[in-house]
């Protein structure tokens, strides 16, 4: 089987650890709603909500998240926290592989594409052998998930927040995480 998205992988882990759990993915991506219903992976995520839908629910219920106390997720690594922006997946994979095998004979050489037109061009370059990269990251939305269609803050602010959140992580990669 091929690789699955972080949404599906996380959903499957939760279902494995807590078989009766109901899983809900929240993000800026409309495509995740369709992905979660794909027959071969529909077991992982029960519901998908966009940031805008969650904001609408909060508004209707009178919930003001900024007034709630924070719940620190000290167990997540920087590598996991920066996936949401272009270059985040590449950086996470490169750093983790380097940590697994620092003397690796074939280094990870990433290349990113930001937005659908750039993804198409990257695919064409790969097919023509016009790149030295051996790991490819394609983000359909400009800026990555932080630029998705249902964002509720500007993508530039989203990228800054993702990077800051990554910088706060206790662990650089999942390998350092004892949990």
Where are the language model's segments positioned?
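Iron-sulfur-associated redox domains of electron-transfer enzymes in respiratory
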Residues: 1-179
